[in-house]
């Protein structure tokens, strides 16, 4: 019997408070998973290329969903990095995102694990 570790960054309880029903949470979790899977590699590429404006657009989207699905510490971290993307030097944004990226990747895995538990094949 495999045991999935408790999520560190994903908060289904918080999502239920915001959304109100389990099916709605699952639908938005699927959207979140697709967004993270598509946008995290793009975000890293934009930061690597020094495209702060492009990175800021994606970070702004991430800032929008984190209060619904994530624990406060990750919400705060996303808000800080998104704020940096508006006025900081590229090197500062790159350094800040290098600390945030592993957390967002962990969140993506937590979302995938939760979805897999809901749809065992």
Feature names for model-found ranges:
Residues 1-57, 61-121:
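Two-component system phosphorelay core
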């Amino acid at each position: 019997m495999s045991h999935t570790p408790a999520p560190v960054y994903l908060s289904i309880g918080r999502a239920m408070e915001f959304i109100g029903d389990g099916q709605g949470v699952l639908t938005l979790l699927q959207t979140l998973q697709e967004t993270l899977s598509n946008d995290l590699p793009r975000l890293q590429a934009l930061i690597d290329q020094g495209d702060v404006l492009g990175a800021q657009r994606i970070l702004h989207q991430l800032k929008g969903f984190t209060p619904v699905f994530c624990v406060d510490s990750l919400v705060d971290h996303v808000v800080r990095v998104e704020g940096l993307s508006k006025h900081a030097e590229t090197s500062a944004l790159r350094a800040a995102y290098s600390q945030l990226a592993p957390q967002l990747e962990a969140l993506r895995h937590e979302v995938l694990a939760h979805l897999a538990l809901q749809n065992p094949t």
